[in-house]
Amino acid sequence: MTAPATTTSVAPVAADDRPTVLSVRNLDISVRSDAGIQPLVQNLSFDLKRGETLAIAGESGSGKSLTSLAIMGLLPPPAVHVAGGEILFDGQDLTRLPEHKMQHLRGDRIAMIFQEPMTALNPVMRIGDQLTEAIRAHEPMSARAARARALEALQAVRLTEPERRLKQYPHELSGGMRQRVVIAIAIALRPDVMIADEPTTALDVTVQRDVLDLLRELATEMGMALILITHDMGVVAEMADRVLVMQSGRQVEEASVLDLFGAPQQPYTQHLLASVPRMGQGRERGVDTKARPLVSVRDLRVTYDLRGGILDRVQARVHAVEKINFDIYAGETFAVVGESGCGKSTVARALTGLVPHEGVIQFEGKPLLRDRASQLANTRAMQMVFQDPMAALNGRMTVGDLVREPLVIHGIGTAQSRTDRATELFERVGLGPEVLDRYPHEFSGGQRQRICIARALALSPKLIIADESVSALDVSVQATVLDLLEELKAEFGMSYLFISHDMAVVENIADRVAVMYLGQIVEIGSSAQVFGNPQHAYTRRLIAAAPYPDPRRVIPARARSNSELKSPVMPVGQSPEIVSYRSLGDGHLVAV
């Protein structure tokens, strides 16, 4: 079931005569540490008008989330504190209000939506109880009246079957539905100001689109002022009236969204906008698909049994990947895209032997075997770069040891030659030999990902599997890492299996693309074919949902999906229907 489609003009210009509801004046935030008091945010000032959407944009460590926590009075005491300035709301300086008065304002007059909905909800309370608890904490009313208000809030956020949702627990809802519940709690008391701190970062792109549409509509309907904290300039372009750009705790630039994107004044803003990958900027790339594939996958199938009951019997089965076929050719970047649960990361794990699978995987014409000797040989030919570099690096080892470790495991070279190789690789990824004796925690996120890439290159692999390898990085760092991957491919002649949910990144880096949905490939072809002439409805939906960093763009009319995503879990004995394909020529296949 879908709601009526609407055509929305993006980022309307704010009226100057609207009253100001919140003023921040010369705000300073500091932290106490062993080294003394360190400034985190310095001399920040801005006004927020009624009904306006102000985006506070910047990269990690810019101070944007600290600013939102300061407004809410939620800075972690005693280390982090407001060191100076004012936060004026309704004639009161929030920095000087006692906690009991701030508790009354929080949720009632100023509400906040956090990035991760699961951590914002109590996992052992039903949704209805959490809503009514928040409502009755601020407005004395009967349980029946509070329940009616809770139901009204769930209806306002367009949640299907709101009566049933009241009785459910958070874990029974999808990520997008949980975020809608968090928004429902925030609007239940009809606040004057809503702060949304990266409200869609943890969500899939189509769910993100629905949540952004919802926030825009609710702000208009309820006359709320909205502060949107984000690092995504595409989201800024589509949502904001005005933009405040922060870097390292300082205000860099503030302007209307049209002025900021049309004529950014500061070098940092210009660099930030130039780093954003844009749809429609991919280039035609030639791949010799008549040559023998480097990797050939046929009828790949991965399932997981779900056990339960007193006898711990298999009760259902997750069909993570179901009978997919694809080839990867020498020197190409083959991208697999899709949303959470589509099976794309499972494909990577199957190729590297990390999960049991059915079907045939061939590397250079030979089947990949699962015995230890074969798997050791496979790791020389195939390496992975994971999403979270900090989790992928042993914090107790120096980065030099981490890069030398694959050479030690495979018995390659002498101690000196391994050090020489590590030095060479560090220089190639933009880090000098002086870093060899440092530890992972001493580096930034982008530098740690470069270390992971250096380690992956140590064995001179023919295929690197990059599983969401840039999704956790700031946009400017992401751009430099993507450029590095392109340079390394050209220099060493490697192939990439690039796994991502970011359609703009994929269009800019991939030679060919496979779109996955519920464990199956629904469209496959060259980047130009898939992005320039998408045929499957799901592919078109993914492309349409991607935020675009241009506030002049008008969001096309689109029906909002209120249905829940289908599940890959099926009863034992049942399997999903295997798709068949229609060929559009030149290797462009679409599921029918």
Regions found by a protein language model. Give the residues of each.
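ABC ATPase NBD coupling module
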Residues: 38, 80-81, 94-111, 129, ...
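Short catalytic/signature loops enriched in Gly
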Residues: 14-20, 160-164, 257-317, 375, ...
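Conserved ABC ATPase "signature" region
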Residues: 92-93, 145-164, 417-434, 543
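A short, proline-enriched helix->beta-strand linker immediately N-terminal to the Walker B motif
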Residues: 188-192, 458-462, 478
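Conserved ABC ATPase signature
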Residues: 168-173, 177, 439-443, 447
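Conserved ABC transporter NBD signature motif
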Residues: 82-93, 359-370
